[in-house]
């Protein structure tokens, strides 16, 4: 299964998404904000298949994180999540076959389906 980097500042959301992805057989590395996630990407110890990130986070937001992750880990896929319309619009600017955007609140089935499509 996939190596997934999860960047989410809300603990409840982070824990739910992590458990769902792990129950599907993925290995999940968890970070609490964009700068912590960026450090994981930069370290290069793990090659991540997928970045799952909130858009609105302290320090480095999810869109900036994705933009920085692409050259550091070529081939990485990105799932961006947000509850704010203007942030969703910004996230959709990264659109392509390697990026998906879902709005909060979401169901775990929506997360799983988005992950499945991105990794296919």
PLM-predicted stretches and their roles:
Residues 64, 77, 84-103, 108-116:
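Alpha4 helix (beta4-alpha4-beta5 surface) of REC/receiver domains from two-component response regulators
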Residues 15-23:
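Charged docking surfaces used in two-component/phosphorelay signaling
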């Amino acid at each position: 299964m996939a190596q997934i980097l999860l960047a989410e500042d809300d603990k409840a959301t982070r824990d739910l998404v992590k458990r769902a992805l792990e129950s599907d057989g993925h290995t999940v590395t968890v970070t609490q904000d964009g700068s912590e996630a960026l450090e994981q990407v930069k370290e290069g110890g793990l090659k991540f298949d997928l970045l799952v990130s909130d858009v609105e986070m302290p320090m480095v937001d999810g869109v900036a994180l994705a933009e920085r992750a692409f050259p550091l880990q070529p081939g990485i896929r990105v799932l961006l999540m947000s509850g704010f319309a203007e942030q969703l619009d910004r996230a959709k600017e990264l659109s392509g076959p390697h990026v998906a955007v879902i709005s909060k609140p979401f169901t775990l089935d929506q997360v799983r389906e988005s992950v499945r499509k991105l990794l296919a």
